[in-house]
Every structure is written in C-alpha cells, then in structure tokens.
Amino acid sequence: MNFPQNVKYTNEHEWIRLEGDVAYVGITDYAQEQLGDIVFVDIPTEGETLEAEEVFGTIEVVKTISDLFLPVAGEVVEQNPALEENPELVNKDPYGEGWLIKMKPANAADLDNLLDAEGYKAVVNA
C-alpha cells in the first residue's frame, strides 16, 4: 500500500496536496483498495464553497456508493475531467492521474491539522 509523504490525509481516507494556492484532493490507496472497482465519480459541487468535512461528491463502485468529504474548507474549482470517461484511474493511480478535484483552501494552515503519512498508517493499521 502506498503512503506518499507529500500529501496530508483525513480519517475518512481522503488526501490533499497543496500546489501554490490550489490543492488537489483524492481518495487514498487504502480507500480505493477497500472500495474495489470504481465505475462512476460524481462531483456536483464544482464552483461551490464548502466547509471542512462536507460532502463534495460520491464514488460509485459495483456494490455501493460512498460519500467524499472535503478535507478542509474552501472552494471546489475543478473536477478531474479524465474521470468522466475513465473512473478506473482512481484505482490505478489514486495519488496522480486519479485525483478527484482541485480546490482553493479557505486557509492553507488548516492542512496542518490533518494527518501525515505516519499518522494515516496508524489509522489504517488500527
């Protein structure tokens, strides 16, 4: 299982990586493995400003639909257009081409309250 050091994690198995004033958000390798084959990603919140831990979309797998929670407060500025045709990118490359949204955090310092790789490993191994 992959735990990149350059991202922050949530207890709900999302990750966030800040690049300038924009952050990429996705689900973790652990989450995609637990979910199984992803067949559809729905992000109806593009252009909206949400609070931390609010639902920003859903991921559909063969057996269920799971909510996606925003790691920090901010504006959802873009969804990954590649996922419309290729939702399996989330399974193949969850920290790269399988990112879900780009967002503008309301306060970048909020990322400091999230888990680092070691903290997240402890969550999934608990």
From Swiss-Prot:
Disulfide bonds: none annotated. This is Glycine cleavage system H protein. Belongs to the GcvH family. InterPro entries: 2-oxoA_DH_lipoyl-BS, Biotin_lipoyl, GCV_H, GCV_H/Fam206, GCV_H_sub, Single_hybrid_motif. Signal peptide: none annotated. One of its GO terms (biological process) is glycine decarboxylation via glycine cleavage system. Keywords: Lipoyl. Its cofactor is (R)-lipoate. The glycine cleavage system is composed of four proteins: P, T, L and H. The glycine cleavage system catalyzes the degradation of glycine. The H protein shuttles the methylamine group of glycine from the P protein to the T protein. The modification N6-lipoyllysine is found at K63. It comes from the Bacteria. Binds 1 lipoyl cofactor covalently. The keyword Cell division does not apply. Pfam families: GCV_H (PF01597). Coiled coil: none annotated. The keyword Nucleotide-binding does not apply. Gene3D superfamilies: 2.40.50.100. GO terms for cellular component: cytosol; glycine cleavage complex. Residues 22-104 form the Lipoyl-binding domain. It comes from Bacteroides fragilis (strain YCH46).
